[in-house]
């Protein structure tokens, strides 16, 4: 009896302890909770938990944090997959910890600098994912002695412009006209705006950068990352290679005063002839002048039916007197007058181009969060030969046929030429240089939710773009990477994106630069950690 008592007693104690352990164990953790725990196992700044920068769906602030960076209500529906975690990084340590935990828990990473990705790739995914929000990573350091700026990826264009103007009346930076756009995505896709004919793209004035790779290693300059990677992230989409931490940019000179204008003409007022002439003039006129077209269907004022209104929106680096001499010589049909011209400081012209009310304060450029009021689809095209008057008339009628007012398809036409034609197509990853007359951005907006309504308007947008095929580039039909379009093609979720599988959109966005981008990707991010439905794949 004594022989069996000790082992039996010992066995009973072990079973009891196991039962107690099971009964006292916490319930299984969710993916977000696992991620928070993982963050706090990573090295931190001054002992402060990394998880303090993160929110998960059970936090009351989660929805606000998510929606502050959602620019398109199409991707805010109940059916849209939400992130497991949003990490609002403040330091590089937070970014490194986020990358590490995504790898450990097999979660995709989405990097959001401003949230303006046209297909929502910076804040949506078909598989479980985490958003790395760069909103707080927004320092801007200006050195007027050498006319350079270090700008972190989460800073907005409006913040950049405002800070430049606070230091100088005669400096600017060539980038977009939407002040809420984040520098991270805008610059890495190319970055174009109303100074492009004079100075080219944003990437043509980026002289250095800092990037963190999939192992958390930071490359502090272009020499450290290598000139091939520095080439790739200027126009090839930085998010396919790593987390862009900051850019070093070179400022450009502008006059103390510039001139802006906006003229509107309908078909009855000669819009077809004017647009036809614009195609001949806008890409070759004095490069100090940029004239954008906005083409929209409207209701006729006198008789029933619809017509087309064309707005000629101009930016001139100089005063009205010289501008009028140029237009009288090169574009007299526009009938631009001194009364049409508005003289402004460059920073004030940024307010005008952002469509803020006349005399709105420049402080509006610092506003970063916008009210999400509508649903939309955007696409792009490049035109490489002027469209005939007959072609323009057909396009205008097709726009009317595709516009169930008050909803409508409409377009912006942005002239190329000038500096853009002087830069080689392989100088940066942005390939669309010489040989293009102008770029088209297609718009379709609607204001009510619903899957059926969305399919209706997406079908209209696709049908109209298909109707534009005879007038735009071919083999491939080129597209602007920053104006993402899933209709061009996507890769399946996961690690298996291949060179051939991604070629359908790779050729449209990058043409002859695509293969080089893939080879650089294979060296710098060989596991394809930084991936999305339209990312650069590894060579396979």
Curated annotation (Swiss-Prot):
Pfam families: BBE (PF08031), FAD_binding_4 (PF01565). It comes from the Eukaryota. InterPro entries: BBE, FAD-bd_PCMH, FAD-bd_PCMH-like_sf, FAD-bd_PCMH_sub1, FAD-bd_PCMH_sub2, Oxid_FAD_bind_N. It is found in: Secreted, Cell wall. The FAD cofactor is bound via a bicovalent 6-S-cysteinyl, 8alpha-N1-histidyl FAD linkage. Residues 1-24 form the signal peptide. Glycans are attached at residues 59, 325, 496. Keywords: Cell wall, Disulfide bond, FAD, Flavoprotein, Glycoprotein, Nucleotide-binding, Oxidoreductase, Secreted, Signal. Its cofactor is FAD. Its EC number is 1.1.1.-. Disulfide bonds join 38-101. Binds 1 FAD per subunit in a bicovalent manner. Belongs to the oxygen-dependent FAD-linked oxidoreductase family. This is Berberine bridge enzyme-like 16. It comes from Arabidopsis thaliana.
């Amino acid at each position: 009896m004594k022989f069996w008592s000790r082992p039996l007693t010992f066995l009973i104690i072990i079973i009891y302890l196991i039962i107690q352990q099971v009964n006292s164990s916490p319930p299984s953790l969710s993916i977000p909770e696992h991620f928070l725990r993982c963050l706090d196992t990573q090295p931190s700044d001054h002992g402060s938990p990394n998880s303090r920068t993160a929110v998960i769906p059970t936090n009351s602030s989660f929805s606000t944090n998510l929606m502050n960076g959602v620019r398109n209500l199409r991707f805010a529906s109940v059916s849209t997959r939400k992130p497991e975690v949003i990490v609002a990084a403040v330091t590089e340590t937070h970014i490194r910890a986020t990358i590490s935990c995504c790898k450990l828990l097999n979660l995709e990473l989405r990097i959001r600098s401003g949230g303006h990705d046209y297909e929502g790739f910076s804040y949506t995914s078909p598989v479980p994912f985490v958003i790395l929000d760069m909103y707080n990573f927004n320092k801007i350091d200006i050195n007027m002695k050498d006319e350079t700026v270090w700008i972190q990826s989460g800073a907005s264009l409006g913040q950049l412009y405002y800070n430049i103007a606070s230091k100088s009346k005669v400096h600017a930076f060539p980038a977009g006209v939407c002040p809420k756009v984040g520098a991270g995505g805008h610059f890495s896709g190319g970055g174009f705006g109303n100074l492009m004919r004079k100075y080219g793209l944003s990437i043509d004035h980026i002289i250095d950068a800092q990037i963190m790779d999939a192992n958390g290693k930071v490359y502090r300059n272009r020499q450290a990352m290598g000139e091939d990677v520095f080439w790739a992230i200027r126009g090839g989409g930085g998010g396919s290679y790593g987390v862009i931490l900051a850019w070093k940019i070179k400022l450009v000179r502008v006059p103390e005063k510039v001139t802006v204008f906006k003229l509107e003409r309908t078909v009855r007022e000669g819009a077809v002839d004017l647009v036809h002439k614009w195609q001949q003039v806008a890409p070759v006129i004095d490069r100090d002048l940029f004239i954008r077209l906005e083409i929209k269907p409207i209701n006729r004022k006198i008789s029933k039916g619809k017509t087309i209104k064309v707005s000629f929106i101009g930016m001139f680096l100089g005063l009205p007197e010289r501008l009028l001499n140029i237009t009288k010589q090169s574009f007299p049909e526009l009938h631009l007058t001194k009364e049409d011209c508005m003289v402004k400081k460059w920073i004030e012209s940024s307010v005008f181009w952002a469509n803020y009310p006349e005399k709105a304060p420049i402080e509006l450029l610092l506003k970063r969060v916008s009210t999400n009021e509508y649903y939309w689809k955007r696409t792009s095209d490049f035109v490489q030969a002027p469209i005939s008057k007959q072609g323009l008339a057909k396009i205008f009628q097709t726009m009317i046929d595709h516009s169930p007012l008050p909803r409508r398809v409409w377009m912006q036409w942005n002239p190329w030429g000038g500096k853009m034609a002087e830069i080689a197509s392989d100088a940066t990853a942005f390939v669309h240089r010489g040989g293009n007359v102008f770029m088209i951005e297609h718009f379709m907006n609607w204001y009510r939710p619903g899957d059926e309504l969305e399919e209706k308007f997406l079908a209209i947008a696709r049908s109209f773009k298909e109707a534009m095929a005879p007038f735009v580039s071919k083999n491939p039909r080129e597209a602007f990477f920053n104006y993402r379009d899933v209709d061009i093609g996507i890769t399946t979720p996961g690690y298996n994106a291949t060179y051939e599988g991604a070629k359908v959109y790779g050729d449209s966005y990058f043409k002859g630069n695509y293969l080089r981008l893939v080879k650089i990707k294979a060296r710098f991010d060989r596991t394809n950690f930084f991936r999305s439905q339209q990312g650069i794949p590894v060579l396979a």
